Amino acid sequence: MTDLNDNICKRYIKMITNIVILSLIICISLAFWIISMTASTYYGNLRPISPWRWLFSVVVPVLIVSNGLKKKSLDHSGALGGLVVGFILTIANFSFFTSLLMFFLSSSKLTKWKGEVKKRLDSEYKEGGQRNWVQVFCNGAVPTELALLYMIENGPGEIPVDFSKQYSASWMCLSLLAALACSAGDTWASEVGPVLSKSSPRLITTWEKVPVGTNGGVTVVGLVSSLLGGTFVGIAYFLTQLIFVNDLDISAPQWPIIAFGGLAGLLGSIVDSYLGATMQYTGLDESTGMVVNSPTNKARHIAGKPILDNNAVNLFSSVLIALLLPTAAWGFWPRG
């Protein structure tokens, strides 16, 4: 009887806690909306953000991050960073949000997939991924900055990607998509390639065979996975455009977004591999037979110099792809 009462008490406390948290979130959303309305009235040229958008931008990232903590996809510092990134991208543009969401969900699933196999291959493998704030920053800093610039340029809301009518805003949209697709492509390649590939990876700089897990090692399976990862993010962006953008009939076609995402995923993975092969140390610990990312007395050098770590490589790859691809896309993008 005591155990039953304890369970009822715990459920009651949990229910009350959820109600209190939801009430606080609603209050925060309303406070942001009031600030938005005040700023719009004072400055005159600012478009107020609806209370529903504020509410969605606060509630949904909280729910996603809470689920990520529960499933060990994030640690506590990663959850805090994820809240900031999620809020800014969601309030800026729902297409940004869905792209980020698909990247996070797919990456988390693939990180856990075949975990026992990856444990034997990766000396730094963590159960569930457990991404910390550094990893969140290196994957989310570029999209977050672009989302802020987008809001300054265009204000919150969804727009068609159309260089002939809104060059700067369209460039930033594609740049943000490129950064997320690059991160997705690299993650899909590193999580799927080592498990499914039947052949040994080859170092991207010399094309020599290297052990599984070597930074800069590529396989056909990994490259195809990176293409699919970027395409997956591109599809999420494209579908959100179809739902939320009103004037698509008088704008440039949006379907190239899907191809752009796939290209960003593939090229991002290639750039990441090249940086990893040249600026990231890889050695083989002969006592364990596992690949390591830092020099030790027992490690035999395979490739790279200890200049960058994996997080820095991811950040540099994201920056390069985000800067270069939208400019290249401008020359080929259909005109409305």
UniProtKB/Swiss-Prot annotation:
The chain crosses the membrane at residues 15-35, 49-69, 84-104, 218-238, 257-277, 313-333. It is found in: Membrane. One of its GO terms (cellular component) is membrane. Signal peptide: none annotated. Coiled coil: none annotated. It comes from the Eukaryota. Keywords: Membrane, Transmembrane, Transmembrane helix. It is a multi-pass membrane protein. Belongs to the TMEM19 family. This is Transmembrane protein 19. The lineage of its organism: Eukaryota, Metazoa, Chordata, Craniata, Vertebrata.
